[in-house]
Amino acid sequence: MLHTASRGCSRSWLRRLTALIAVSALAFVALPNVAVAANPMEYLDVSFGGTFAEDTYTTGGDEVARGSVTKHGSIPTKLDGGGITLAGGTNGVTFTSTASFSASGKVNKGFRAEMEYRTKQTPSNLATLFSAMGNIFVRANGSNLEYGFSTNPSGSTWNDYTKSVTLPSNNVKHIIQLTYLPGADGAASTLQLKVDGVAGETATSAAGELAAVSDSVGNKFGIGYEVNPASGAASRGLAGDVFRARVADSDAPWEILDASQLLHVNFNGTFSGTSYT
């Protein structure tokens, strides 16, 4: 009798388990589709460990270039340990992304860009550290580093929205980090800049204005080079060393950090024993 009761108990337990599995399966099938946020895209991340063949750069190691990297003028000189030296003037590097950042003559997709560089002498006036689509720029202007963008809302009237910080010193590596955010639904567009982790003022457009795109450079970025095709812009290259350049989605995390940024702690976390989180 004890043996028979045990068998009955086992069958009852098995029926309950089978029913539970069936209910769980139905519940899983009935779940609504849940949107999963896509990871931020990285379009360019190079330290110039690859090679230039003629005008085109071939990435090396784990470098990223979702598009083409091209030199203008002379072939950049490679530095021991990574990086290149740009001669300035009409020389520089451009990145043409396979992703679209513009439509109808406007930069309608935001992005982040980072560059680690060093100058050995004060840059010439309007020498360009970074540019995008022809009317987004970071450049020397006298004793200042000027950054901003130009808009052309009416098709005939140009508006410039710029801010500036003190020009970084020579013979020292510096990191610039910028974020362009196009205004949505009639809002203002913005360009934010940090130099070695210190943020400058935000360049902000009038409501509804987006950075303008110059002819044929809708998805083009300049590294130590001005991509604007106007004849006066062709000689605005930066003379200096570029160690790394990166372009990513506007919500991507920063990747190029100096010691001061890595060690920044405001102690809003917690201690567990001797460890801080």
What are these regions (language model features)?
Residues L17-A30:
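Bacterial N-terminal signal peptides
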Residues N33-G92, G183, T202, A206-V217, ...:
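Extracytoplasmic low-complexity segments
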Residues P40-Y43, F52, G89-G148, A184-G186, ...:
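Extracellular glycan-recognition modules
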Residues A87-T90, N152, D215-F243:
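Extracellular glycan-interaction patches encoded by glycine-rich segments
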Residues K194-V198:
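Short strand-turn-strand beta-turns centered on an Asx-Gly dipeptide
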